[in-house]
UniProtKB/Swiss-Prot annotation:
Regions of this protein lying in the Periplasmic compartment: 96-106, 165-167, 238-255, 312-318
Taxonomic lineage: Bacteria, Pseudomonadati, Pseudomonadota, Gammaproteobacteria, Enterobacterales
Xref: Pfam families: Na_Ca_ex
Domain of life: Bacteria
Organism: Escherichia coli (strain K12)
Parts of the chain on the Cytoplasmic side: 1-16, 59-74, 128-143, 189-216, 277-290, 340-345
Gene (UniProt): chaA
A biological process from GO: response to alkaline pH
Protein name according to UniProt: Sodium-potassium/proton antiporter ChaA
Membrane topology category: Multi-pass membrane protein
Gene Ontology CC terms, in alphabetical order: plasma membrane
Regulation: Pronounced pH dependence with sodium as substrate. Ca(2+)/H(+) and Na(+)/H(+) antiporter activities are both inhibited by magnesium. Ca(2+)/H(+) activity is inhibited by the proton ionophore carbonyl cyanide m-chlorophenylhydrazone (CCCP).
Function: Sodium exporter that functions mainly at alkaline pH. Can also function as a potassium/proton and calcium/proton antiporter at alkaline pH. Does not play a major role in calcium export. The K(+)/H(+) antiporter activity may enable E.coli to adapt to K(+) salinity stress and to maintain K(+) homeostasis.
Family of this protein: Belongs to the Ca(2+):cation antiporter (CaCA) (TC 2.A.19) family.
Major localization class: membrane
């Protein structure tokens, strides 16, 4: 076996599974403890376990994505993020203690962390390194065309209704609309307009990571199996740690929306770091595909799945954002339309997005 193959194969040894397994053992033995230092330690270990498996999910999805090529590659990664998010939300909802606003807060946080924070940092760092970066304008517009109405329908429109929320029938209809919109988008992305999501002059030569996106010595089935194993690990750790996390947040007097922020941060961390690196390698199109693909897939698929789970379990869901959150989210989506209106970006675009990200943090922690 060559050194290159051995290097790739070594990268895919599943030692990262040790952390979620260790977290599960600790949670089983001491998860009911109410002592604050123990609760903090348990939550830190659970966080390490969840992140370890989340990074592994994205790593295996990345190998499968490379074999499928664009735009299927970004689609695989986006769907992996959605599965992680639905798993986390469902596990927290299953405890019976999750707030009705958990899905709403998570969706809001994902939209703002991506469109404000990650896009802002990407454009700022990329602009400093390359001055001006280029992307396929028409592809970005397709994401925004689909994303804007979904965000408005799911998170803003309910406030205008008499009860300031969807009825059960309306919620199920919105779930159907969300899934249908994503189906239409997938048709555009994978069948009729694939070229819109690829920038032909993307600089692949600057990618100095010998492992990122490169074919593995293992089979696709091997990666698919381990991807599923790590997803199960994330679900198991989250479910067992739910009560301990609630104890910690109560002791910290954390704001209600902080749980949604935490879920969004956990699921976006692996893909976000990978996309930031892509921008620094002058692969901004790939990064934006990952960012906006994740947000679009999150709204389109999380809403139907979580709505059905809530309907079957009798849990209540609150959809409408408050006025400050609405203003910040709509402003961020409008800014995305402006920033990507020419197909060129620089540091000013990044600074503008980060300014709105700071406003988002005010709505969470103020």
């Amino acid at each position: 076996m060559s050194n290159a193959q051995e290097a790739v194969k070594t990268r895919h040894k599943e030692t990262s599974l040790i952390f979620p397994v260790l977290a599960l053992v600790v949670l089983f033995l001491w998860g009911s403890s109410q002592t604050l230092p123990v609760v903090i330690a348990i939550n830190l270990l659970a966080l390490i376990g969840i992140l370890s498996s989340a990074f592994s999910v994205v790593r295996h999805a990345d190998v499968l994505a490379h074999r499928l090529g664009e735009p299927y590659g970004s689609l695989i990664l986006s769907l992996s993020v959605v599965i992680l998010e639905v798993s986390l939300i469902s596990a927290l909802m299953a405890t019976g203690d999750a707030a009705p606003t958990l899905m709403r807060d998570t969706l809001y946080s994902i939209i703002m962390i991506v469109t404000g924070g990650l896009v802002g940092f990407s454009l700022l760092l990329g602009g400093r390194k390359f001055a001006t970066q280029y992307m396929n304008l028409f592809g970005i517009k397709q994401y925004l065309i689909a994303l804007f109405p979904l965000a408005i329908i799911v998170l803003v429109f309910p406030m205008a209704l008499p009860a300031a929320n969807f009825s059960t029938g309306q919620a199920l209809l919105v779930a159907l609309i969300s899934a249908a919109m994503y189906g239409v988008f997938l048709l555009i992305q994978t069948k009729t307009h694939q070229s819109l999501f690829v920038y032909e002059h993307e600089d692949d030569s600057d990618d100095d990571d010998p492992h990122h996106g490169k074919p593995s010595a293992h089979s696709s089935l091997w990666h698919a199996i381990w991807l599923i194993i790590h997803l199960i690990a994330v679900i198991a750790v989250t479910k067992m740690n739910a009560s301990s996390l609630e104890t910690l947040l109560d002791s910290m007097n954390a704001p209600v929306a902080f749980t949604g922020f935490l879920v969004a941060l956990l699921i976006l961390s692996p893909e976000g770091l990978g996309a930031l690196k892509a921008v620094l390698n002058n692969q901004v199109q790939r990064a934006m595909n990952l960012f906006f693909g994740s947000v679009l897939a999150t709204i389109s698929l999380t809403v139907p799945v979580v709505t059905l789970i809530a309907f079957m379990t009798g849990n209540e869901l609150q959809f409408a954002l408050g006025a400050p959150e609405m203003v910040v989210m709509v402003a961020s989506l409008v800014l995305c339309h402006i920033s990507f209106s020419t197909g060129r970006t620089n540091v000013l675009n990044g600074a503008a997005h980060l300014a709105l990200f700071a406003a988002y943090l005010m709505t969470i922690f103020a």
